[in-house]
From Swiss-Prot:
Species for this entry: Sinorhizobium fredii (strain NBRC 101917 / NGR234)
Keyword list, A-Z: Plasmid
Membrane-crossing segments per the record: none
Keyword Amino-acid biosynthesis: no
Entry keyword Magnesium: no
Any one biological process term the GO annotation gives: cyclic threonylcarbamoyladenosine biosynthetic process
GO molecular function: tRNA threonylcarbamoyladenosine dehydratase; ubiquitin-like modifier activating enzyme activity
Organism ancestry: Bacteria, Pseudomonadati, Pseudomonadota, Alphaproteobacteria, Hyphomicrobiales
Protein name per the record: Uncharacterized protein y4oA
InterPro entries: ThiF/MoeB/HesA, ThiF_NAD_FAD-bd, Ubiquitin-activating_enz
Pfam families reported for this sequence: ThiF
Length: 593
């Protein structure tokens, strides 16, 4: 057999490291395995290996080496082996490693790796067949092995169906399904869409299950009636073949009820028809942890012909554990935050608070998004010229539907000298602001305005609300995050007095980092988001710590001071933690005496 070899010495690892290649081949021989190359080109080496087994002769393996060998793991398939787990049913790739890449060690020979892991996988399969579950669990990763992921390589790239992880399905073999569908921007060969599986119903009788939906949806959506059918795995690989199996099952189930067959057949003739296949698959590890798995098959009429194009659309399970990667999220879903100032610090803080699962977020700012803001604002070109609160509100509304976002396009504390403008006001601004603060669990001030800070700090202390302020310094050389609890010693005025008297450290500033952009009538400081987000993230951490101290450690400091430079040079971000003691010149400090 002539094996094609192509590429420079540095492009092919076996040529770049000939000694390693020789050791790899010798390792197979050391285990009594024969080998021959199937392909050896463009950085890829695939060996056909006859691996000896103690009692069953040998197993043929195809061993694919990564172009970045030895740093990255190999791919090993067993074309003639059929395992119920730990093997892709289509490619026959063996799952000998978990998803944790740290299990592959560059110094090991692939043959030694096979000798260790293959026997372990086969032992696990024997234990599972004998229902020795605890023994099997001690040898394999305790993770489910669902059917669905093995089919996703043939799924459409840009379409998606979202469904309730606790979706209730009628005790029936088939029925109709209600989808909410929205077209997406044209990409790929098939017009993409996103859909929500709202409800599945039996063909007859009344089904009382509550329809499923997202908390909020934006833009035009339409109702699409589809079908659902129960099938049993295994399934063929091609979507057309799965749909053909579903059609046969529908025909069999509807044989006694011709009207039902006609109804489901008319759905199949729609320009876009969705058939949901329900089946049992592992949802969690263990012998009795199966639940409903879903395939979504889409049949589209090809324009100008009678042909139809069938594809598989990826389904995404939405459930109460969606935020399980962030344990504090469950404690935040009932919390209300008012954030004042949506600039370089506040815009990122707003996004992170919504991302973290805060239940209610009200954002307040008076400014518009300038093109020059792009280098240090959370959103980009598509929102230039919009009010900052509008841009953030719309982004958060679309992307974090479990957070209710309110907005106020206003400058807190601004005075008016025109009588006509006062008459245009919709109520008393003070009453509006006080109502927001009274209803909130915490106020976050990223306005970078000492006037605004003084007013909000006073109102929060008098009303009894927690208050967090955060801002960067000139030239993005440092920053400050301070947090105040109602009734706690040390207040905003105390902080200012300590800074004035130099009894608390000040953050670093770079007075040369101030510019007046062309066309702008106010100075601003230089600095990019990659530095300023240091402050934003501590604002968020401090806010979450005050909102949910039992879940997320809030720390025992009141003041965090950030330095990003020292002696004119960049340093690694350095935070200093301080306590704000009551100051003798402040009324709260005097009361302590």
């Amino acid at each position: 057999m002539n094996v094609l070899k192509r590429g420079s010495d540095q492009d092919n690892w076996w040529q770049a490291y000939p000694g390693l290649y020789a050791r790899e081949l010798a390792a197979y021989e050391g285990h009594g395995a024969s080998h021959r190359p199937l392909i050896q080109q463009d950085g890829t080496l695939i060996l056909e290996v006859l691996w000896p087994m103690d009692s069953a002769g040998s197993i043929r393996l195809n061993v694919g080496y990564s172009p970045l060998h030895p740093f990255c793991r190999p791919s090993i398939s067993a074309p003639e082996l059929q395992l119920e787990r730990h093997q892709n049913p289509f490619t026959r790739d063996l799952c000998l490693l978990t998803q944790d890449s740290a299990q592959w060690y560059p110094h090991q020979m692939v043959a030694d790796f096979i000798a260790e892991r293959l026997s372990q996988v086969l032992q696990v399969m024997t234990l599972r067949r004998n229902e020795q579950w605890s023994e099997a669990a001690s040898l394999e990763e305790q993770a489910p092995d669902p059917v669905t992921p093995y089919h996703m390589h043939v799924a459409e790239e840009y379409s998606a169906v979202f469904f309730d992880g606790q979706q209730t399905v009628p005790n029936a073999p088939l029925g109709t399904a209600v989808f909410l569908l929205q077209d997406r921007l044209e990409r790929g060969r098939s017009p993409p869409f996103q859909a929500i599986l709202s409800k599945v119903e039996p063909l007859s009788g009344t089904w009382m299950a509550k329809p499923f939906d997202l908390p909020k949806r934006a833009g035009p959506w339409k109702n699409v009636i589809g079908r659902w059918i129960r099938l049993e795995p295994p399934f063929p690989e091609a979507p057309e073949e799965i749909l053909a199996a579903a059609e046969k099952a529908i025909e069999r189930q509807s044989a006694l009820f011709p009207a039902h067959l006609k109804k489901l057949g008319s759905i199949a003739d729609d320009d876009l028809s969705i058939t949901a296949v329900v089946f049992q698959e592992e949802l969690s590890y263990g012998p009795d942890n199966k639940g409903n798995g879903w395939f979504f098959l889409v049949s589209r009429r090809v324009p100008g012909s009678r042909r139809r194009q069938v594809s598989l659309v990826r389904g995404y399970r939405l459930s109460s554990d969606m935020l399980s990667r962030l344990p504090v999220a469950s404690a935040l879903k009932s919390k209300k935050v008012v954030l004042v100032g949506c600039g370089a610090i506040g815009s990122f803080a707003a996004v992170e608070l919504a991302r973290s699962g805060v239940g209610q977020l009200t954002i307040i700012d008076f400014d518009l998004v300038e093109p020059g803001n792009t280098v240090r604002w959370a959103l980009g070109r598509s929102v230039w010229g919009l009010p900052k609160t509008t841009a953030l509100h719309d982004f958060l509304y679309h992307n974090y539907p479990w957070t209710n976002v309110g907005r106020g396009h206003a400058k807190v504390g601004s005075a008016i000298s025109n009588v006509d403008d006062v008459r245009k006001l919709e109520g008393n601004p003070m009453r509006w602001l006080r109502a927001l603060i009274e209803d909130a669990d915490i106020v976050v001030d990223t306005s970078a305005s000492t006037e605004c800070q003084g007013a909000l700090a006073y109102m929060c202390r008098s009303i009894g609300k927690r208050y967090v302020l955060g801002h960067a310094t000139e030239g993005a050389a440092g920053g400050v995050v301070a947090r105040f609890k109602p009734g706690a010693p040390g207040c905003y005025v105390c902080l200012q007095q300590h800074w004035s008297g130099k009894t608390l450290p000040l953050p670093t500033i770079d007075s040369s980092g101030t510019i007046v952009p062309t066309g702008c009538n106010a100075p601003t400081f230089t600095g990019g988001a990659f530095d300023l987000q240091e402050v934003s993230m501590e604002v968020v951490r401090s806010t979450i710590g005050l909102l949910a101290p039992d879940v997320y450690d809030s720390g025992d400091w009141q003041l965090s001071i950030l330095d990003l430079t020292e002696n004119g040079r960049r340093i690694l971000p350095r935070w200093k933690a301080e306590t704000i003691a009551p100051h003798s010149s402040c009324s709260c400090g005097a009361s302590q005496g």
